[in-house]
Amino acid sequence: MGKVAVAFAAVAVVAACSVAAVMVGRRMKSRRKWRTVVEILKELEDDCDTPVGRLRQVVDAMAVEMHAGLASEGGSKLKMLLTFVDDLPTGREKGTYYALHLGGTYFRILRVLLGDQRSYLDVQDVERHPIPSHLMNSTSEVLFNFLAFSLERFIEKEENGSDSQGVRRELAFTFSFPVKHTSISSGVLIKWTKGFEISEMVGQDIAECLQGALNRRGLDMHVAALVNDTVGALSLGYYHDPDTVVAVVFGTGSNACYLERTDAIIKCQGLLTTSGSMVVNMEWGNFWSSHLPRTSYDIDLDAESSNANDMGFEKMISGMYLGDIVRRVILRMSEDSDIFGPISPVLSEPYVLRTNSVSAIHEDDTPELQEVARILKDIGVSDVPLKVRKLVVKICDVVTRRAGRLAAAGIAGILKKIGRDGSGGITSGRSRSEIQMQKRTVVAVEGGLYMNYTMFREYMEEALVEILGEEVSQYVVVKAMEDGSSIGSALLVASLQS
C-alpha cells in the first residue's frame, strides 16, 4: 500500500505541476498579447505626436502655401478661391430671406427675418434632414429635384393658408464643396468631397442647376448667392462682431476662409473692390506638408478612399475620418492579439465606427465605461474587460488630440499669413508699425465636430494658446457659430439687397 500511495502522490504532483505549467503558460501568453497591443498603442502615440515645435512648422508651411496659392493658379495645394464677397453684413439689413445648405451629412433649410438693427435677427423654421445616401452618387437632376421638392414643402408649410403667392423669395445656396466662382451668385463645381460622386456635375454651374430645378417646380424663388459654408460662418461672425476675419468649419469635412487684402491676391492683379478686401475660400482640406504626423493607418485609409492622394489634411482632422482611423487601430490590435476576442466581420467594414461614437467613447465617465462597452458591442466586439475598454478610450484620445492640435496649427497659419499671430508673418506689404500693433481677432468656428465633441474643441483651443503664446492669444477670440453657415449665407443675400 505504501508503494501505491507513493505512486498516487507522484502522479498528483506531476498533475499539479502540469496544471501550474499550463496556467503559467497562459499567463505568459496573455502578457505577451497585452504587451503587443501596448506596443501598438505606443507606436500610435509616437507617430501622432504633435509637440509645439512641430506645430509651428505646420503653421509656417500653411502660411507659405497660402501665399503661393494667391500668387498663381495651381501654385499650391491650397486653391485659395475668390468668393466675390467683398462686403459683409453690417447689421442694417432687413427683410425675409431663405437659405438652403447642402453639407456632407445633412441638408438644412431655414428662413431669416431681419430688422434694421443688429439686435433683430429672427431665425425661423429651421429644418435639418440627413442626406439620403442614394443621392450622393445619383445624377444632377435627381439631386437638385430632391432639393427643390424639399424647398417646396418648406414653403407650403410656411404659407399654411396665407396669401403669399406672387412673392419672389431670395435664396442663399450654401454649398460645402469646392467651387470656382464667376460671381457671388454663380460658380462651377471643381470636384466632389465628403463621399459625393456625381461626376457629371463637375464643371457645371451649381446655382444654375438649383435654379433650373426650382423653375421646373414652379417656385418663385431666386438663387441670389452661392456661398461656401465657411463664408456663411464668417458672414454671421462679422454680423455680430466686425473683428471677425477668419472662419473655420470642422464637421464631416473641414475648410477655412478669411478676409484678404485685394492687393495680396497677386493672381488677380487689378482686382478692385470698394472695401479693398475679399473673402478667400482656402479649401484647406487639401493642404499637405512633410511636417504633418502621418501614420500607417492614415496611409491605408487614404489608399482605400474614393479620393486617394487628395484631401490629406482633411483626412487627419475631420469628422468623416476620425472614427475610421480609430477602427483601423482596433482592427490591427485584434489581428495581432485576441484581447478583443475573435475578429468581428463588422469591425472590418470601413467607416462603421462613426466619429460621434468616438466622442461618446472618449467622454464616457461611467466607472465601468458602459457606453464604451455598448459601442464596441455594436461593432461586434463583446464582453471585453475594463482594461481593454480603457485602452480603446486611449486610442480615441490619441487620434482626437492630434486632430485638434493640427486644427489649431491650421488656424495659426492663417493668422500668420495676415499678420495676426504676433510675428508679422507673410505680411504682403504691411508696414512694420501695422505688424507690431496687435489687433483683436475673432475666429468664427462651426461644424458638428467642434460643436459636439468637447475633447476635440479643448485640444484645439489649448494648442492655439501654446502656438501663439499667452501674450498674443489673449487677442485671439474663438467663437462658436451654430448654424452659422446657413444663417450667415442668408445675411449675405440680405446685404446684397440693401
Swiss-Prot record:
Residues given in the record as D-glucose binding sites: 193-194, 228-229, 255, 283, 314
Annotated ADP binding sites: 104-105, 252, 448
Reaction it catalyzes: a D-hexose + ATP = a D-hexose 6-phosphate + ADP + H(+); D-fructose + ATP = D-fructose 6-phosphate + ADP + H(+); D-glucose + ATP = D-glucose 6-phosphate + ADP + H(+)
Tissue-wise expression: Expressed in roots, emerging lateral roots, vascular tissues of cotyledons, roots and leaves, root and shoot meristems, anther filaments and funiculi of mature seeds.
Region (Hexokinase large subdomain): 228-483
Mode of membrane association: Single-pass membrane protein
Gene Ontology MF term list: ATP binding; D-glucose binding; hexokinase activity
Induction note: Induced by treatment with 1-aminocyclopropanecarboxylate (ACC) and zeatin. Repressed by treatment with abscisic acid (ABA).
Residue numbers spanned by region Hexokinase small subdomain: 90-227
Domain Hexokinase: 35-494
InterPro entries referenced in this protein's UniProt entry, alphabetically: ATPase_NBD, Hexokinase, Hexokinase_C, Hexokinase_N
PANTHER family in the record: HEXOKINASE (PTHR19443), HEXOKINASE-3 (PTHR19443:SF73)
Family designation: Belongs to the hexokinase family.
Designated name of the protein: Hexokinase-3
